Amino acid sequence: MSSGCSLRVPVTDQTSHRPWPLPKSRWVMFMRWHDLLFLHWPIRPEYIRPLIPAAIELDTFDGWCWVGIVPFHMSGVRPRYVPLPLSLPELNVRTYVKTAGKSGVWFFSLDAASWIAVRVARWLGLPYYDARMKVESVADIIRYDSVRKHKNSVRAEFHADYGPAGVVYRATPGTLDYWLTERYCLFAALNPDRVVFGEIHHPPWALQHAEVKLEVNTMTQSIGIELPEQRPLAHFARLQEVVAWPIVPLAANA
């Protein structure tokens, strides 16, 4: 990407893979996502349904909901026209939903190690939480430690070593790998009465399978989801560049 306040980013040059056209309005945020780990577990829909507003339809694959935990590190986070970027670790807990003809990510929580980022995101209606986080990398192994420390919140921890395994590939449409990762909008509700929506765009994911040593994971306990004992489906992505559009109340997008 060019330096300074350039309004063009190469990420928007590639759009043929999208399930719907880019928004007509201008994007408002650019960011780079690094060393992402996608962990996913199958969960029966009846356990997810009470956690999502009734107006939002659950998105399932072969009859199953999937709950994901995704730790990563962001850099170059900047609003449009602002040349001073922010870097921070982030860890989200998610499932998948659809409404108004669009399927996307439902965020249960997003933990981040940036006081200002958490405050701005919560003002927008996103369920961000303060966390003490540390990310270290030695060769291809990423050490990720996160402990939620948000005031009046339930403690949630994640401690793991992970890294890539195998060749880089792009998921094929119709496969579970594709369904879990190729998402271009988000939904969330910090307040149960106010669902918010946002569009994002990025190139197709360059995925690898992941090797994971998961030591502690209590990220879903605060929302009442008990993860199965089976090993999660694990994917790794080295880098993704992303642009995002404004977060708006869902009704405003209808």
Predicted features and spans:
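Short, solvent-exposed secondary-structure boundary motifs
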Residues: 49, 84-86, 120-125
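Short, surface-exposed, charge-dense and proline/glycine-enriched linear segments
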Residues: 6, 12-15, 84-97, 137-141
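Hydrophobic, proline/glycine-rich low-complexity stretches
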Residues: 2-78, 216-254
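A glycine-rich, hydrophobic loop/mini-helix early in the fold
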Residues: 60-67, 72-111
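Internal, well-folded beta-alpha domain core
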Residues: 36, 92-254
